Regions:
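Vicinal oxygen chelate
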Residues: 1-2, 5-14, 46-50, 69-153
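Core segments of cupin and vicinal oxygen chelate
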Residues: 12-56, 60
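Hydrophobic pocket/interface hotspot
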Residues: 19, 23, 82, 99
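A short, acidic/glycine-rich surface segment
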Residues: 34, 42, 64-70, 106, ...
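Short Gly/Pro-enriched turn/cap motifs at secondary-structure boundaries
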Residues: 38, 73, 108-109
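Glycine-centered loop/turn positions within well-structured domains
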Residues: 54-56, 80, 126
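Acetyl-CoA-dependent GNAT
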Residues: 60-63, 133
Length: 153
């Protein structure tokens, strides 16, 4: 393959500080840039580093209400949700606890077979997921969405 991952995902927000705080407190993310990256003074661009080669480019645009619009799964347009990769099962557990403490996720962990997953919504309501390799996976075995992970029962 000629690629080794995603560089960034661009999102809209009505409250940059709230998103910075959330991603910093839950994921230990770091803000790399924060300011008017474009000539238009009504546009604020913030770059939040969420992983070794992954960033959220957050745009706060005066008067734009698109970040407040919520739609059901598969009705969200071309990008349905954002899935992040936890560094380890221990990091996954830490992130999961932090998400639950903030009310961003419930206690349900999905077992897809080779992958464990927890879904959450960020403060703007963006549907997101954290994934990690399943240490209990059986080779060649997959499970449908909605299968509760036994280790979190």
């Amino acid at each position: 393959m000629l690629l080794n991952g995603f560089n960034h995902v661009a999102v809209l927000t009505a409250d940059t500080e709230r998103l910075q705080e959330f991603y910093s407190e839950v994921f230990d993310a770091v803000t790399l840039r924060d300011g008017p990256e474009v000539a238009d003074a009504d546009v604020r661009m913030t770059v939040i580093h969420v992983g070794p080669s992954a960033e959220l480019n957050v745009f706060q645009i005066k008067g734009n209400t698109e970040a407040e619009r919520q739609t059901p799964m598969f009705g969200r347009g071309r990008l349905d949700h954002l899935a992040l990769q936890a560094e380890s099962i221990e990091a996954f557990d830490t992130i999961r606890e932090r998400l639950m403490a903030r009310g961003a996720a419930d206690d349900f962990v999905t077992d897809f077979g080779s992958i464990l997953s927890v879904f959450f919504r960020d403060p703007d309501g963006l549907e997101c997921e954290v994934c990690v390799a399943n240490p209990d996976a059986q080779p060649g075995v997959s499970h449908p969405p909605g299968t509760r992970a036994a280790r979190y029962s």
